C-alpha cells in the first residue's frame, strides 16, 4: 500500500532455520566454522553459594546471602579483581532473578529490561585463592566472568533446594515471583492429586 514491506522476525528466523521454504535459485548465505585451541589457555575456577528465602504465598525470592571464592591466579590489582567479581555477581543475579526477554506477536519487547539495583542485592561475601597459572609469565587467569557465570546456577540450586520438600523439581529462569509461585502451586496440586488417587 505505502510501498513498504514488512516481515516478522520469527518468520525470518524460521525461513533461515528450515531453508526448504527458500526459492531454489536463491542462495541462503555463507557458513564458516573454525576452532581455536590456544596453547596458553588458563582456567580460573571458583565456588559460589547463594542463600535464599522464598515467600510461599507470593513466590518472591529474597537473596539473603551470597558467598563466592574465586581463583584468578596471581592477583595484580585486588581492588579491580573484587570489582570484577561484584559486577559479575550483579549481572548473574539479574539474569537469575529479573531479566527476561518477552516479545509480543510482532517480535517487539513487551517490557523494559529489569536489572537489580544495589539495594536489591545482599552484601557479597567474597574471597580469592591463588594458584598461579603456568601458561603465562605473570601467573594470571581471568576473573571478569566469574560472578556472571557462577551466580545463576548458585541461585537456581538454592531455590530448588528450598522448594524440594514441596515437590518442586525445576523452575525456569528468571526466577520471577510468578514463575516460582506457579511451580509451588503445581507441585502442591500434583501432591493433592496423588493423595486423592490413593
Spans of model-derived segments:
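C-terminal catalytic domains of large/alpha subunits in multi-subunit enzymes
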Residues: 1-198
Amino acid at each position: 500500500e505505502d510501498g513498504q514491506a514488512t516481515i516478522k522476525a520469527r518468520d525470518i528466523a524460521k525461513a533461515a532455520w528450515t531453508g526448504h521454504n527458500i526459492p531454489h535459485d536463491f542462495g541462503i548465505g555463507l557458513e564458516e566454522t573454525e576452532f581455536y585451541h590456544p596453547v596458553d589457555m588458563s582456567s580460573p575456577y571458583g565456588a559460589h553459594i547463594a542463600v535464599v528465602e522464598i515467600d510461599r504465598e507470593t513466590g518472591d525470592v529474597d537473596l539473603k546471602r551470597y558467598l563466592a571464592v574465586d581463583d584468578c591466579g596471581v592477583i595484580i590489582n585486588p581492588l579491580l579483581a573484587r570489582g570484577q567479581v561484584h559486577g559479575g555477581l550483579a549481572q548473574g543475579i539479574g539474569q537469575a532473578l529479573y531479566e527476561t526477554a518477552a516479545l509480543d506477536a510482532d517480535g517487539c519487547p513487551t517490557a523494559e529490561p529489569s536489572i537489580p539495583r544495589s539495594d536489591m542485592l545482599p552484601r557479597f561475601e567474597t574471597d580469592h585463592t591463588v594458584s598461579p597459572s603456568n601458561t603465562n609469565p605473570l601467573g594470571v587467569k581471568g576473573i571478569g566472568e566469574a560472578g556472571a557465570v557462577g551466580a545463576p546456577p548458585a541461585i537456581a540450586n538454592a531455590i530448588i533446594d528450598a522448594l524440594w520438600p514441596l515437590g518442586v523439581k525445576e523452575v525456569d529462569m528468571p526466577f520471577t515471583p510468578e514463575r516460582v509461585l506457579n511451580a509451588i502451586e503445581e507441585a502442591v496440586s500434583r501432591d493433592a492429586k496423588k493423595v486423592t488417587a490413593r
